[in-house]
Amino acid sequence: LLLATWHDLSDVTLAEALDERASFRRFCGFAAHEPTPERTAFVRSRRELVTRGLDRVRFDAVTRQLEAKGVMVRTGTLVDATLIRSASIRHDGEAKWAGHRRRKPTHGDTAQVATDRAAVLIRGVEVTTATVHDAAELEAVLPSQPGDVYGGDRRSAAGPSAFAGRSTEAVIRARGGPPQVVRSGTWGRPEALVRLQAHNAAVRRIRCRIETVFGTCKRCHGLRRMRWLGLAKAGLQVRLAAMACTLRRSVTLPHAAAA
């Protein structure tokens, strides 16, 4: 399933690639004479992963392994959310319509993501319907001792900026990390406005790194839209993409190569 995510393959093309490509066989541990799975095996595997919640277990295992090897360095955390189109407007009853500022409304789900600041590797991910507030799963995606937490300034379907409220900042402080979020306004003299603008610019300059993760997952790992129906399978797809993106990015890091 990771190979399918890395190469954006359907079940049929993945089965064909496993049968024909020696590199795919070696990666999956198949000998040259062994039969490889048919496409129906991937359908059953996904069903088992979703039913037993093993997609979360696998994602957490990857995160722990990278932390143990020193690839993920706790120098701060970036949090944000991105909207992903549903597989079908007509048949996906769990996905919802959501608009974002002046953009065209989208029928889909939201991936709420936390990454480390230094390497921008994904440390936490949750999937909700598109109408859920961007910071609704903040407590679930934030790691313990996250350091400075940089929140996005994207406005959610609920209206206000997602990470600038008292409740979300309380969640961040409870985890031991000071919030570094974009502020929407201030009272006082012009000097106060200048300080506010400088603060927001500094936060955006760091927070924008998480956009590269969203872009990579959508461009290279099949998250331009959901492949399967339902929120549970959407969560599986997003976690597979998160693992694929994190593993591929981790091998290019200088300290990972040194280790």
Report the location of each language-model feature.
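A short, flexible helix-boundary coil/loop motif
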Residues: 197, 220, 248-259
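Helix-centered, glycine/charged polyanion-binding patches within enzymatic domains
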Residues: 147, 153-156, 161-239
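Alpha-helical support elements that line or immediately flank enzyme active sites
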Residues: 1-9
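Residues within the helices of the helix-turn-helix
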Residues: 12
